[in-house]
Structures are given as structure tokens and as C-alpha cells.
Amino acid sequence: MSALKDVDQLTEAEARAEHARLAREIAGHDKAYYQSDAPKISDAAYDALRRKLEAIEVRFPQFIDLLSPTQRVGAVPSGKFGEIRHAVPMLSLGNAFNDEDVADFVGRIRRFLGLAESDVVAVTAEPKIDGLSASLRYVGGKLVHGATRGDGQTGEDVTQNLLTLDDIPDTLPPGDWPDVVEVRGEVYMSHADFAALNERQIEAGKDAYKNPRNAAAGSLRQIDPKMTSQRPLRFFAYAWGEVSEPLSDTQMGAVARFGEMGFPVNDLMARCETVEALLAVYRDIEARRAGLGYDIDGVVYKADRLDWQERLGFVARAPRWAIAHKFPAEQATTILEAIDIQVGRTGALTPVARLTPVTVGGVVVTNATLHNQDEIERKDIRVGDTVVIQRAGDVIPQVVRVVDPDRPGRGEAFDFPTECPVCGSQALREHDAKTGKLDVVRRCTGGLICGAQLKERLKHFVSRKAFDIEGLGIKQIEAFQEEGLITEPAHIFTLKARNEAGEIKPPLQEREGFGETSIRNLFTSIEDRRTITLARFLNALGIRHVGENTSALFARTYGSWAAFHAAAANLSDEAVRAEMLGIDGIGNAAVEALEQYFTEAHNRDLLDRLVAQLTIEDAEAIANDSPVAGKTVVFTGALERMTRDEAKAKAQALGAKVAGSVSGKTDYLVAGPGAGSKAKKAAELGVETLTEDEWFDLIGA
């Protein structure tokens, strides 16, 4: 019945059922289209299904999950095209949202490189094009392949489609170019071309695209390159991946060479030597935004000197030498009708505002996040208030402020619950012993006895970036968990044995929605996932503060589950803790979360049962023959040739583990002038001590 109702007429229970039905149906059509090239319905009918699913998720954001079809677009390669592994990963950028963030970015560069305040830090500024990232690999001047960004490590092979763009040459003009050069940039569609395309779509009885970015992405990813050739796509070059020799000494110089190669480059790009100059360029580009003729959503800043970029390196998900300064979000005014509390997989109680529907940036918004208890109290948000909401890009809308907080007849202040609305356990705000402050998030203390936490953790466990078990989606996880068939991850891998032993009644293959074939396929998918990489396994555990990037750092550092487990289970040991905190990109929050997780006996038991079902692959060995790969290094004293942060990042890039204190596990102590107690302890323990010059001789720098 819910399938016949408009989304705004659905109850939450009806919406949940309809969401599950749509997700299942769309997944089936995706498989038919992308894997079998045999679509069962028209594009218009498919788009209608997706539009309804998206509308439900706008109204009920608690249904949004990594498993939802709406969350899979633009991530891992779809299977529609061949895959290309990027020689150099295509990473994302960190964000700046105000002037202070930009000043902090420049300050971080200065501190990392050990520059004086009087030293000039030159930074480029250029428009952030709102399109689809692509990487073009040229060998001997010939385009050999082109790929989308994908998940940053692997993209889709869209070479033939990219060759249809007039802005992309199949052969570079004569010139002194590197033999191998990967040109990276953005595929986009101008406003005028977008309007003309939508007119043609409507005339042909097809749905119009929502915005130029979606149109560009959809056009580039057509199965038939002839279809792409009929779409007015453009390209701006602004970055590079693998190159066999340097393009230039500077960012500005490298981009200028792209222009010489025949690629369009953005003429608004500028080089600045002060924060004030950067902000002036930002405001100038923002003022020109409406008249540019194409979509931009901010300004990108990059350290101009390429030797500085190399020294600055990367953190887990982004370069230290670049940042995106986003434009302010679009805003609108509406009525806050109710405040609901959602419980996430880590027990966080998140308040959600239910709003009178309002259009913001072309999207109808009915829900917005209120973040936490402190935010509600600070902004004095109450049910019935007229509020300003804002939406930036694909970020969940948020309530900015109350329009008239002094109006007569306002409702009562919101009473934030101190008990979990799902399981009734106490919901507490943890006390941070170091800051002396309460955590801003109130969390359910029920752990896995809380149905909401258990369900969300199980859904995370099988999600795309974790175990990625095909056929075990939202509906199945919810049904199996509610029935008690799967109440911990290990139960997934015993499901087949229990079903065959007659412990599950009625048997799964005899249940509505299942059959012999679907159950056989499900069991095959589960068996295929018994072997998993260490990084995916750690991410799948859903430990607070240990997400995808942190898991990858741990995997790269420790190499094996045995080594990681030995460290995580012994964080009360100061040397073990110091070694983990010495990993570039790992902070106190992740270490404390791990210590708390491994302290709990039921978590250790759960892990033992799970690991017994799996083969956890060791992380790939670091691809170099560095003499310090796998060694533990400690730096002390005043280094003269580079800063401490820079030395640490360099050592880790060579495969070394950097610790903060000397122990029996330390292989080298690199001691600069002023080395004190660490040098003494190293001598007592027989740890080899190197001068800074000896260290550079060792690593060949």
C-alpha cells in the first residue's frame, strides 16, 4: 500500500518498508544494467525509482546508510567499465570554511617546514570546479588510458568517452614533455550547454538532469562513447599523477605547461604571498561566480613550490599542501515542527529537526541535523520556532539560528533525554580527563544490548567499505537481527551451517523473498568474504574513531592482525602506547577508543569468535628496499636539516615506525643537539644512536 502513497504521506514505518523495497529493486536493476548490460526497465522508470528513494531519505535521513543505492554513486567502480588502478592515488582535499581556517592552513605549512615568520609562503589560488575528476595517462605523447577518480585508488576506464571531448588531445603536440605524464583535471558542463541539454532531454520525453555536475557525470559514464560525444563536455587541467620527470619547480609552472600541451587551464588561477592576498582572490572569484558560466563551489589553495609539496606530504586522506576553501552554504527559512533523537552505531544520540518542507539550492529539505545537546541549548532551539537552515553541497542540512527568539508564546526548552530512547539504558556524556570538559555527544551505555547500536554496527560490518557482502543488505540484516539469527558479526559466517543443521526454522530457502538460488548465492558471497584485508577488517569492527583511513594507517604500520592485536590489547604499556601515538595521523582519540574497546571482555570474546571464522590477510609490504623499513625510530633533540614533523613523515614514508619514546623495541635513536634523557636511555638499552647526518646517510637522502 505504501508504494502507492506520496512520500509526504508515509508514516515512518511505511517509509522504512518502502525504502527497503526500493533499495532492493534498484539494486536488482543496477546489476542487470551494469553487469549484464540488459536493463529491464526504461531510464525514465529507473529514475523515478531513484527519485522516490532519494525523497524518502530526505524526509527520513535515519534511513541513509552506506548500503543504500544513493550512497554508492561516485565511489567504487561500478563494474560498468573496466578498472584502472591509479599509479598515484587521487585523494580528496581538506576543507576551510572561514578566514581563520585559511590562516591556519598557511600557519601549518610554516610550522611543518620550520619557516620563520619573515619567510614568504607562496600559495596558488584557483576556482574549485564542480564536476567529475578524471586522470589522463600519456606515454610517449599518446593517451593510453583515462579514468575517473573512483574511490581514489581505483577508477573506471572511460578512455574512449574522454577521447570524444574536444578539450582532451589524443596526442600531445611536439614538445619537451615527460615520457610518462598523467594529467588530472575536472570534466564539467557549462550552464548554457546544460540548459540546452535539458531542453533536448525534455523534448525527447526524458527527465531533465538536476544540475550540471550530474549531467557531466552521467554523460561521461555512458556505455556507448557515441552518446558521450553528443554531450557538450568540457575539461580543465589543474593537477597531475605519475610523471617520469618533474613538470616544473612550481604549481604555477606545471599548470602553465598543461596549457602548452593544449589543455584548457583556468585563467583565474593566481599566485599569492600572504593570507590577505589569498582571501582577496577568494572574494574576487566568489563575486565573479554567477557570471563564470560554469559551477564552482569554492577556491583551492596549494603550496606553490613543488619541493615543499613533496616535503609536506600527506595525511590519511588529503595532502598537507592543499586545501579547499568552500563558499558559504545556501540558506532558507522554515518552521521546526519536532525534534527526534536517533541512536547511531557508536551509541551517539543525535537530535534531528523535522521541518516544514522548504527548497534550498534546488533540493526540498524536510530534516536537518541539530548536532548535539549543547548546540540546541546554545542556539535555544525549540519546537515551533521559525529557523534558518543551510545546506552546503551534499552535506546534511543544519539549523543555523532561530529567527525570532524573543517572540511571545514560544514553546518550552527542549529536554534532551538522559536515557536511550531505544533500549532505556543510561545516556551519558563522557568526561575528558585531559581537558576537564564533558564530551559534546551524549551516548547510550547499552552497547550491543541496544538494538539500535547492534543493528547499525551489523549494517556497517557488511557495508561496501567493510566486508561488502553481496545479498546481505539493509533488509536482510534488519530481519536477521530482529529474529535473533545474527546478533554479532561471527553469526554471519555460521549462518549456512546453522541453516543446514536445521537450527533455523523455517529454513531460509523456504521463506518469503528467498529461494534456493538466492540463498545459495548469499552463502557463496559470505564464503567469499572469509578472507579479508587487515585494513577492511579493522574498519568493519566499527570502533569509534577508527574509520577507513585510520584502519589503513594501522594496517600499513603493524602489517598483520597478530601484530596489531598485540599492540591494541596492551595499550596500558607505556612503550606500546607511545609507539602507536607515534604513527603519523593517529591521535589520542583513536588510541583511547582502542584501549576502551579491548578492555571490555565481551568485545575480546566477540573478536575471538569472529577471527576464528576468518583469514585476515597481512598488509602489503611497503614497495621499497629502504634500510629502515620495518624499523622503529625515535627522534630527539633539535634537528637542523628538517623539522621534527618532516623527519617523522619521511621516516614513515620509507616504512619505518616512529615512536615517541625509547624502549627495548627501538632500532634507532636519531639525536640532534640538546638530546637528553632519551639519549641516556638509548645508551642503557644498547639502542643504536645516529646523528642527523648519519640518519640521512642511512636513508640515502
Swiss-Prot record:
It catalyses: NAD(+) + (deoxyribonucleotide)n-3'-hydroxyl + 5'-phospho-(deoxyribonucleotide)m = (deoxyribonucleotide)n+m + AMP + beta-nicotinamide D-nucleotide. Its cofactor is Mg(2+); Mn(2+). DNA ligase that catalyzes the formation of phosphodiester linkages between 5'-phosphoryl and 3'-hydroxyl groups in double-stranded DNA using NAD as a coenzyme and as the energy source for the reaction. It is essential for DNA replication and repair of damaged DNA. Zn(2+) binds at C420, C423, C444, C450. CDD domains: BRCT_DNA_ligase_like, LIGANc. GO terms for cellular component: cytosol. Keywords: DNA damage, DNA repair, DNA replication, Ligase, Magnesium, Manganese, Metal-binding, NAD, Zinc. PANTHER family: CHROMOSOME TRANSMISSION FIDELITY FACTOR 18, DNA LIGASE. The active site is at K128 (n6-amp-lysine intermediate). Residues 623-701 form the BRCT domain. Its EC number is 6.5.1.2. The gene is ligA. NAD(+) binds at D43, A44, A45, Y46, D47, S92, L93, E126, R149, E186, K302, K326. This is DNA ligase. One of its GO terms (biological process) is DNA replication. GO terms for molecular function: DNA ligase (NAD+) activity; metal ion binding. It comes from Maricaulis maris (strain MCS10). Belongs to the NAD-dependent DNA ligase family. LigA subfamily. PROSITE patterns: BRCT, DNA_LIGASE_N1, DNA_LIGASE_N2. It is an enzyme of class 6 (ligase). InterPro entries: BRCT_dom, BRCT_dom_sf, DisA/LigA_HHH, DNA_ligase, DNA_ligase_AS, DNA_ligase_CS, DNAligase_adenylation, DNAligase_N.
